[in-house]
Each structure stands twice: as C-alpha cells, then as structure tokens.
C-alpha cells in the first residue's frame, strides 16, 4: 500500500492510499517516528455490516460518490448530470526544500470530468500540518460545488471525544467551552461573511479519558463564512473533523477549466494537553509574523470618541509621549462627515473643520513629539449619507427592489467588485502615501446582508480583502496593521498572516478582559493580542479593581493606553510612565515567549507566565469572585514556574533575591504576598 510520511518539528503525519486508489486515508498522526509502516490506532479491519470501506476509513477528503453515508467533504454535480464523484488516484508529487515539505495527491473522475489535488505542507520549524484542496472542472459545462471543504482530520478517541471550542458575542469573545461527544455530530457554523464573534474557526479534540494527554487541534485560515463538523463514534474509537468554507448565498460554480482552491485547514498534535496545543499554535504564528516591534499605542477613542479636534488631540499626544507611549492613533471621527456613527464612512479624507491647520501639519506635530502616528479606518463600511454612496450606490450589497438593512447605521461595500476593491485600495494607499502614517487599524463593524446575486460572493469579498492587505504591506512595509471587527470578529489564521496585531474585544473591563484574553491565548499568540488600560469606572468596569490590576492585564499582550489621560493628574501620569517602562523592558519576552497559563481567570487566582531566552515574566492576579472584591486568604497563592531551567539560578528583579530553577519549579513563589495586592509582575533573570 502506497504511503507518504511527513515530518513536522516533533510529530509525524502519515498518509496512505486505499488499495483501489479511490481515496487517501490517514495512517498515523502523533509523536515523531522514523518508521513509515506504523501500525497506527486508525487501522480498521474493513467495512462493517450496513457500511462501506470508505465510510469507516480515515478518509483525508471524502467526496459523495466515494463515501455514501458518513461525513462528506465534497458534493459536486452538473446540471442534468450525475450528482457525486467516483475518482481514482492519478498521480502524486513530494517535494522538500529548505525544511519545508509539500505533498500533492491527484485524483480524477473521468466520467464527471473533475480532477482534485489534495495538498499538504509541513515544516521542521513548527508542528502544524497545512492542508487544502484544489478542484478543477475539466468539462465544457459548469460544475456546481454544493460542499467544498478544505480537509478532514481523523483522531483516535476510544470511548468518545472531549471537544474544546471558543464561543462568545460582542464584548464577550473567546469564551472557552467544551462538550463530551460519544456519538453523533458537533457543528460550529458562521454565516456572517466575516470570521465572527459567536465562534472561532478553531477546535481541539481529546480522548475522553485523557484530559491532559494527547490533543489534536484544528483551525481554518478563512475570514468569511465557515463551518466545522466533528463526528464522533466511540464504538469505532475515532473522531473526524471536517473544516471549510460555508457557501451561504449559493453553491460555488466552476466554469469550464476553472479551479477552486480551498482556504488552508491547519491541524496539529501535542502530547501535552490544551496547554501544549496552545504553545504549538503560538510557535506557528510566530513564524507568520513580520520582524517588527509592536509599539505601545495610545488610542484617543475613549477620550474623545467622535469629537475629534486637532488641538485636543495634540494635548493628548503630548501627555502620551511624556509617559513613554510610542505611537499615537486617532480612532473613528477624523474624516469628513463623521460627527456620529450615521455619516462619513467611505469618505476617507481628513475633515478640515477638525484639523484647521491642515492634516499634514497635525501629523507633523505628532511626529515632532517622537511618536509614530496611526489612523482608524473601516474600508468596508459605507454610510448612507456619504459621498461615496451618493456617487456609487451600486457598490454596496443589495437586492434590487428590497429594503436594505443597516447595522450600526451603515451598509457594506461590495469588496468582491473589482472596481470597488480598486477604489478601497487606492483610498488607503493615498492616505499612507500622503501622510506620515506608521500604524493602521482596519475595523469591520457589521456582518453581510442582502448580498444579491453573483458567483461566490463570499469568496470574492474575502480574496480582495486579502489582496488589499497584502498590497498595503508590500508597498508600505513600515506600517503596522491592526485587525479589528467590532472587537475580535476577524481573528483567524488568514488575517493573522496579513496583520501584525489583533484587537480581541471592545470590552476593556479588567475581569472580563482577563477571561477574553485567557481564551484568546488558547488559539492565538500574545504578540497578536492588543490590550489597553482604560479608565475606571468605565462602560465595562463592573467590579472594583486597582489600577495595577488594569496595567498587568494590559501587559499580557501588546500594551496600549486608551484612557482619557487629559484628566489624569501628575501622580497618575508618573504611575503610567513606570508601568510602560517596565513593559518595554520585557516586551520581547511577553510578545514572543513561550506561554504557560496557571489556573483560570474565573477562579480566585490566575497567572500567565512567559519564558524566552534567559528571562521569565510572571503576571499574576487575585481575581476574587466575579462580582466582588478580592478574596481574603491566610496563605498567599503560589505559582511553580514551568519555563525555568532546573539547573540554572535566577535573580528576582523586584527584591534582588536569588533562587535555583529547581527550587522555583518545585516549591514555587508567592507573587501576591498579601491581600492588599491584587496584581503583580515578577521578572526572573538567569544569572
């Protein structure tokens, strides 16, 4: 039986061909092995009564016609023709270059005139297996793809599976959830046209009886509508996860000779539970990042909202520079017609009434303070009262003759149109070329409705979103791009590959934010997690917490300040300067270090540890009860750092004490020594 063995940094992924060449199946996925004929846990004896071999095999990609009853990844049909596909293996290629291996398995259906290529890519730099499918219409008539997933991954789960997922809503993103699945299907779907707030395109699978052991995790690199199905069969001892796009408006139709390329579905294995899977995702995402320093940002939204005035913004910028902020960002409200959320979107020109001395002069004043300068934009948003809509009403999504839905008082630009996409790119390129801008925050504040007619509307919109981001990064490499969608509504691996940092949630209340960040770090690396210190009391601040608590929470990723610092006295400004200086001294460790989470933020104590090179940073919080003050206990909580070297010695910066790594790992330390402290930063340097 033909078999291909793929190696990642620490794992093996082995694929073999069915005896008749009708499908590829997973033979082994786990810790790295040298053998290519591993008797893996996915072996099967053959079909059971009332099934076929394909329906019980660990099929890597199953079309209807090869499979009949079990989970499917492809459903293709021609008008007036046969619905289904019966293909055979027609060739393969295996290439290895610079530590990256790519496998391409080709299948062909001569009767339906369809070819498919199952694609795999792995690297010795990380443990992620990237997979995608290419479906080509070889006939002279259209081919409809009712379902066209990216890939499927099969995991051994004797006795059933424990599925971990991320769910939420606006201001409550990245909540962790789990479900036990012994039989049947668990589905996550998103039909919004953007990645979504309700669920993340991410899933982790564990055997029910091994919660801290072998863990498989999958994620979809797609920023539109998507679906993930997990089918478990405890009798068979397997769980199969199928991921891919979800064509909401209509099936995807391929013209003669056209090829559909699915977005990548990514999977990884870790022997170390959810924590190990999180670290594996972080390592992969660090490989996607550009070599840029993510600045400490001040964003003026909470200080002024839509009431943007140049003189007030400069006063904020002066104070921001004095406390050590590195980039000043003007959020919503800087452009013409934008005095509230009912106008202006689409007219991306500075409002001369708000910048009477000229926008060039305003930007220069900010830069003269030693600050970078940034702007908020929402390129896909169109206000009904905007000049853009008046001139191009056909550029927004709509169904002729039907009412148009406004959400947040705005429409959505049909980015799938070549002319609209070219206009959006030109508008952004003009801003970045004309003004000395080093930071761009790309927001998207509503889902898609009334998309109308047309081929693959979701695919065309997302493809042009990617193309614009790629062009901006190519032509303006010095600009840091932050991704945002009403908070964390566009957090996915495809956006991660094209943005430098993400905004996880509009909720900056410290207790809520800790929960959001805890879930975010399960799927995404800390260098992607923008987090601000905002005023208390604030809109989301429902429980009393110290200012230290807020700073330590924001230090857990990419620190920013979003408070109205014009109202701060000198004591508060000096306090902010100390925290920012401390963060900048350990920024590389926090953003790029190996992460270990201790406890759960919904409990009385929580800590996050970052280890890189010779430094360990431990952030700790006495979270207390959800609606009350910190819990009073007689013994302070202790943390045993996991990132220390037992053979080394460490100096604790705050008190200059020395400890062996072995003692720290065994006995731990007390980062919050008394009830008067609800948050702390402990830094350990190897000596």
Residue ranges of model-derived segments:
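Conserved, mostly hydrophobic/aromatic
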Residues: 10, 133, 257, 298, ...
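Glycine-rich, aromatic-flanked loop segments that form ligand/cofactor-binding clefts
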Residues: 53-55, 63-86, 207, 211-226, ...
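Polysaccharide-binding surfaces and accessory modules of carbohydrate-active proteins
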Residues: 1-5, 9, 13, 24-231, ...
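Short Pro-Gly-centered flexible turn/kink motifs
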Residues: 84, 252-270, 679-684
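Carbohydrate-binding surface patches
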Residues: 10, 600-646
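Aromatic-lined carbohydrate-binding/catalytic grooves of carbohydrate-active enzymes
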Residues: 293-426, 439
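C-terminal beta-sandwich/jelly-roll accessory domains of carbohydrate-active enzymes
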Residues: 414, 624-687
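Active-site neighborhood of glycoside hydrolase catalytic domains
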Residues: 356-358, 390-392, 396-548, 558, ...
């Amino acid at each position: 039986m033909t078999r291909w063995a793929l190696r990642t940094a620490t794992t093996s992924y082995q694929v073999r061909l069915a005896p008749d060449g009708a499908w590829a199946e997973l033979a082994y996925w786990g810790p790295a092995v040298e053998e290519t004929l591993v008797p893996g846990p996915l072996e099967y004896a053959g079909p059971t009564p009332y099934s076929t071999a394909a329906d019980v095999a660990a099929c890597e990609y199953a079309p209807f016609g090869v499979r009949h009853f079990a989970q499917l990844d492809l459903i293709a049909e021609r008008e007036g023709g046969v619905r289904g596909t019966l293909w055979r293996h027609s060739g393969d290629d295996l290439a290895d270059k610079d530590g990256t291996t790519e496998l391409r398995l080709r299948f062909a259906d001569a009767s339906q005139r369809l070819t498919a290529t199952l694609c795999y890519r792995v690297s010795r730099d990380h443990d992620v297996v990237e997979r995608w499918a290419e479906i080509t219409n070889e006939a002279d008539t259209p081919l409809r793809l009712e379902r066209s997933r990216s890939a499927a991954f099969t995991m051994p789960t004797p006795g059933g599976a424990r599925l971990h997922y991320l769910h939420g809503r606006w201001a409550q993103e990245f909540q962790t959830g789990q479900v036990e699945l012994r039989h049947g299907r668990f589905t996550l779907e998103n039909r919004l046209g953007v990645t979504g707030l309700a669920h993340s395109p991410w899933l982790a699978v564990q055997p029910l009886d091994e919660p801290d052991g072998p863990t498989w995790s999958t994620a979809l690199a797609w920023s539109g509508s998507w679906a993930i199905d997990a089918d478990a069969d405890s009798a068979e001892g397997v769980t199969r996860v199928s991921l891919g796009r979800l064509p909401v408006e209509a099936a995807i139709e391929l013209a003669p000779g056209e090829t559909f390329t699915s977005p990548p579905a990514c999977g990884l294995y870790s022997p170390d539970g959810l924590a190990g899977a999180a670290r594996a995702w972080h390592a992969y995402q660090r490989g996607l990042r550009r070599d840029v320093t993510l600045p400490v940002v001040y964003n003026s939204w909470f200080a002024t909202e839509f009431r943007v005035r140049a003189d007030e913004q400069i006063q904020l910028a002066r104070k921001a520079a004095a406390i050590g902020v590195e980039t000043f960002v003007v959020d919503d409200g800087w452009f013409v017609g934008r005095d509230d959320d009912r106008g202006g979107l689409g007219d991306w020109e500075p409002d001369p009434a708000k910048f009477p001395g000229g926008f060039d002069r305003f930007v220069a004043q900010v830069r003269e303070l030693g600050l970078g300068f940034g702007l908020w934009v929402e390129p896909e948003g169109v206000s009904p009262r905007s000049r853009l809509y008046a001139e191009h009403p056909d550029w927004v999504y709509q169904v002729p003759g039907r009412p148009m839905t406004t959400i947040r008082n705005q429409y959505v630009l049909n980015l799938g149109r070549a002319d609209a996409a070219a206009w959006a790119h030109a508008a952004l390129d003009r801003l970045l070329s004309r003004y000395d801008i080093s930071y761009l925050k790309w927001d998207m504040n509503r889902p898609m409705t009334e998309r109308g007619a047309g081929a693959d509307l979701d695919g065309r919109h997302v493809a042009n979103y990617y193309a614009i981001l790629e062009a901006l990064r190519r032509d303006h490499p010095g600009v840091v791009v932050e991704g945002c969608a009403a908070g964390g509504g566009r957090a996915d691996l495809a956006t991660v590959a094209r943005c430098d940092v993400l905004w996880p949630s509009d909720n900056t209340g410290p207790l809520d934010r800790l929960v959001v960040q805890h879930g975010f770090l399960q799927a995404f690396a800390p260098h992607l997690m923008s987090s601000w210190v905002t005023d208390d009391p604030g809109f989301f601040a429902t429980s009393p917490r110290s200012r230290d608590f807020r700073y330590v929470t924001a230090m857990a990723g990419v620190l920013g300040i979003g408070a109205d610092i014009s109202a701060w006295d000198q004591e508060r400004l000096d306090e902010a300067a100390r925290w920012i200086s401390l963060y900048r001294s350990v920024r590389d460790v926090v953003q790029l270090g190996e992460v270990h989470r201790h406890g759960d933020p919904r409990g009385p104590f929580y800590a996050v540890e970052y280890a890189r090179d010779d430094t360990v940073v431990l952030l700790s919080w006495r979270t207390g009860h959800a609606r009350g003050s910190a819990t009073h206990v007689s013994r302070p909580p202790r943390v045993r750092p996991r990132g220390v070297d037992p053979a080394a010695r460490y100096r604790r910066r705050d008190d200059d004490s020395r400890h062996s790594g072995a003692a720290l790992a065994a006995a731990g330390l007390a980062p919050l020594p008394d009830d008067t402290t609800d948050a702390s930063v402990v830094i350990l340097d190897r000596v």
